[in-house]
Amino acid sequence: SDVCSPDLVSRGHIDGCILAHDANLGFAETMAAKGARVRIPTTINAISVDRRNWRQQGVDHAFGSRASRLADSYVDMGAVPSFTCAPYLLGDPPAAGECIGWSESNAVIYANSVLGARTLKIPDYLDLFVAMTGRAPYCGTYADSGRQAQRIIELAGIPEDVDDGFWPLLGWVAGKHAPDRIPLLRGLENLQAGTDAMKAVCAAFGSTSGAPMLHIAGHTPEAGMPSAPAADRVTIDREMLADAWRQLNSGGADIDLVAIGSPHLSDRKSTRLNSSHQIIS
């Protein structure tokens, strides 16, 4: 049965802290100047600069100062200076059935799909009002009916010995096949998938789909709930995944920069990276 109500939003996550345009800064500073305060525990997404070190890093002052002011505004309003796009990796992740008010696509998809928490994909600016009031519109994935799979995706011919690269590829392709609806993925029940694998699926899925969650049979807690009566079916086979892999690896051979951490790496991933590669700072 439905477990959420608009009065039970327990925590928030702010995504409007990125300096995407001047409106983000103007909105935050105006609200802070008016005395706005969050009333529920609220984390802050990754921001546009290293708040402590952007000057030493040579960031343009006009940009760095504005980006830092934007972050400061949300801290001044009582948000926790977490500065991560993976708040579910912090020490107190949401529980199954907990109603939260999060923004940022991978965080929302992971919370709904893997943790079984409930949140809309809260847009910028509204994320602050949710944090200020502890209330959110009761619709969509807050309700049982808004969490049903509307497309069943059968995975065919997938070997059991997949490596780490499989999971983001799967999420990217699944999103392509369910760009506007919640899917249920079947056929992966025998695969081993930990936190990092699920994080990779959710983040990549959010880059190609607007849906706020997905179900994976054998891996996510609500995969057994009844699908929507009108749910249709599609198949993703091994060759389709191979085609996508080739598409994603079609760039030039010369590489100037490798950027990692979108979303932020877990401690496990950071340790593995540090132990197997020479880190150049």
Predicted regions and their residues:
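Glycine-rich phosphate/ribose-binding loops and adjacent secondary-structure elements
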Residues: 228-272, 281
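N-terminal basic/disordered segments at the start of proteins
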Residues: 1, 6-34, 119-123, 130-135
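Active-site cores of enzymes that catalyze phosphoryl transfer or operate on phosphate-rich substrates
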Residues: 202-238, 248-250
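General beta-strand structural signal in soluble alpha/beta enzymes
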Residues: 9, 38-42, 81-85, 118, ...
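Short, small-residue-biased leader/transition segments that mark boundaries at the very start
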Residues: 2-5, 273-277
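A generic, well-ordered mixed alpha/beta core segment in the N-terminal half of proteins
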Residues: 44-134
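Intrinsically disordered, low-complexity linker/loop segments enriched in Gly/Pro
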Residues: 93, 125, 131-163, 167-169
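Extended, H/D-rich, highly charged conserved domains that either
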Residues: 162-219
